[in-house]
A protein has these predicted regions:
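Amphipathic alpha-helical transducer elements in NTP-driven molecular machines
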Residues: 7, 52, 103-111, 134, ...
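C-terminal boundary of histidine-terminating zinc-finger modules
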Residues: 231-244
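Extreme N-terminal, non-catalytic leader segments
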Residues: 1-23, 37, 64, 249-252, ...
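Phosphate-binding loop that captures ATP/GTP phosphates
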Residues: 42-44, 48-92, 107, 205
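Phosphate-binding/switch loop-helix module in NTP-utilizing enzymes
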Residues: 91-140
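Walker A/P-loop phosphate-binding motif and the immediately C-terminal alpha-helix
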Residues: 12-47, 167
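Glycine-rich phosphate-binding loops of nucleotide-dependent enzymes
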Residues: 86, 110, 129, 142, ...
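Conserved catalytic-core segment of NTP-binding enzymes
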Residues: 123-124, 130-228
Length: 267
């Protein structure tokens, strides 16, 4: 298998995935990517959630379009300066059109996106995968063997059960686990600003200790995150003082401590 060209363009690639749905994985992936741009990095965001591609909606770029040049290279959508997005959503005639594909078709589509896209210069590639340990994360792991992984969970035990499967999946495929993110750790009261434990707090810490992986951070719930996603606003940019933004930026800073520098330019 020939190495995808993106390996040469993104010294840091990270698969963001989860064991189950509904944990806010796409929102986390989008805001990590935004946070990296706030730290001056050039970032690509690849949406391989083939059956539920939501990143264009979350980032407010649903109405934009991909372009293809004379060399048959796909050019991503520019979300903001330094952030480029590729999503299968841009290839659908209508947002409500379902994709009914089996595994080999999904693998080939992901391979095409990895090899045919002209990202330009990238420092980081953030890959948003669907929940579970199925075809899409497996394809990414096979096509980008140098990819690292972040597992997103919520505090309740049902989510933690599936989180353990996701961690073991990454270990079986020799993906470097950057760590786990506990999303929705608490709810920030919109009236008094105090945290409310609507789920059991500390699930991320338990997984971190039990599985021997770092806890990258615990992200509190904030009603503004929902509003930002619904209206396509970049949350960490629009609400820099939110405790959730501060928690996300702490995760970003931990990722940057592990950053691989770009290779030296060839003479």
């Amino acid at each position: 298998m020939s190495p995808p060209v993106v390996n040469e363009l993104a010294p840091n690639s990270v698969l963001v995935f989860s064991g189950k749905g509904g944990v806010g994985k796409s929102t986390i992936a989008a805001n990590i990517a935004l946070g990296l741009t706030l730290r001056g990095r050039d970032v690509g965001l690849l949406d391989v959630d083939i059956h539920g591609p939501n990143l264009p909606k979350i980032l407010g770029v649903e109405d934009k379009h991909l372009s293809v040049d004379e060399h048959n290279k796909i050019h991503p959508v520019m979300v903001i300066p330094k952030l480029r997005l590729i999503s299968i959503a841009y290839m659908l005639p209508d947002p409500s059109t379902p994709i009914i594909w089996r595994g080999p078709m999904k693998h080939n589509a992901i391979r095409q996106l990895l090899e045919q896209v002209d990202w330009g210069k990238l420092d980081w590639l953030i890959i948003d995968s669907p929940p579970g340990t199925g075809d899409e994360p497996l394809s990414v792991a096979q096509l980008l063997p140098a990819t690292s992984a972040i597992v997103v969970t919520t505090p309740q035990e049902l989510s933690l059960l599936d989180c353990r499967k996701a961690v073991n999946f990454a270990k079986r495929l020799n993906l470097k686990l950057l760590g786990v993110i506990e999303n929705m750790s608490t709810l920030i009261c919109p009236h008094c600003g105090k945290p409310i434990d609507i789920f059991r707090r500390g699930g991320g810490t338990r997984i971190s200790t039990e599985m021997g992986i770092p806890l990258l951070g615990s992200i509190p719930m904030d009603i503004k995150i929902v509003e930002a996603s619904d209206y396509g606003k970049p949350f960490v940019i629009e609400y820099p003082d939110s405790p959730a933004t501060q928690a996300i930026m702490n995760v970003v800073d931990k990722m940057l401590q592990l950053e691989v520098p770009p290779p030296p330019k060839k003479e």
